[in-house]
């Protein structure tokens, strides 16, 4: 890589040094540009032309670019190829006299932190996982241990902690394995989860022993962090800070040091990759298309500790041989159990069904409650079909609300959220009708107290969120722009001052002309004129 010779390339190199492992999308006007090796890699993946900068000076710099307004599609392709992407935005509006605008990385998107509509599969979770090992767990392979002074060194059984989060839905869970089968149980759980990215303490390996053939296709990107990130005391502190609690008893993490360490590493990493960028509201206003997500982890408001044995344990060999969610050979997904029974109407339902298949329920009461609820709806064909039709027009509320919280929602995402929430009252009414019909003729529907309780709880727990619907309806225009910073986002009448400012921008010439006429009359100077140039802005000229 040649030494940068221009202020722009010096700025690029300074930013790139901060994110050496990511493909850097560097905003230049209406394009995101990539340079040097990043450009070579991206051009092959995106199938775009690789050009060069400064060829005439004998210092050709490979480069390629993508339009900023279509960046999400290109970013999705880079993420699916297993790369991390750092987005470097212009933090100032280019203007006269500015030789170079300030630029900063506002967000780092990785395979495990992707949350955009085009970045993740609608019917699958996009998990980011972390694995923490105590002293003695996987030491033979050089695995780094978290929690100084803990583990086998003092006679405590070595343990492996696993935590995982789906940033696009808010699901956040953790577990822990111990004993001589801990490594095998970790492999089984990762085989079920299929995370896109796994965090490890440097210089640990994911599997400290030989990897079984059935795990070859895990395909997760391995990201190594400093080992202090997995230190248990630090992890507990960062989790307490994130959840705004004094202790972690309410989350079931007490006594599970490695699960705590893994969960803390996840929160640390999410802060590192998301809490980047605009330093002030003024900065945020400059870059509305890709606002930073650092203040947007509030939807991760709880973590659930679970034991693997709470559901039927399926190892990777069983999942593969039974073709539960993926075909054992080839790419024909129609051969799987999931495809055979999946008639879900929403992405949320599809992900739930997939999870149920991979973690079969073993609690008799829960199994019977599900079956009874199914029996009720099966006996009511009309109600069932109406519920299905209503669900079909409800978009992915989990991911829409997550995008809002992350600060990356577009104006049209907000309209989609409003439209989906407007269907909730009708859905609640349909559930209430189904409950009444089942109760009026229990012999026909096979209704039991358990089944009716399940439909009843669904009816009661559905929040119609009328205040959110009303806020969006009053505030967002019916046909908003694709980008938040473009004119026409806020509905006229929502804010009088904003309406006045819009009028000024639209009727600027008329306003200046009227002001000029008023000043002529007030001063009695007929030659008074209001002029503008790029050096002084608006000024009064008297000749």
List each language-model region with its residue ranges:
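Charged catalytic and DNA/RNA-contacting regions of genome-maintenance
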Residues: 1-376, 385, 392-405, 409-441, ...
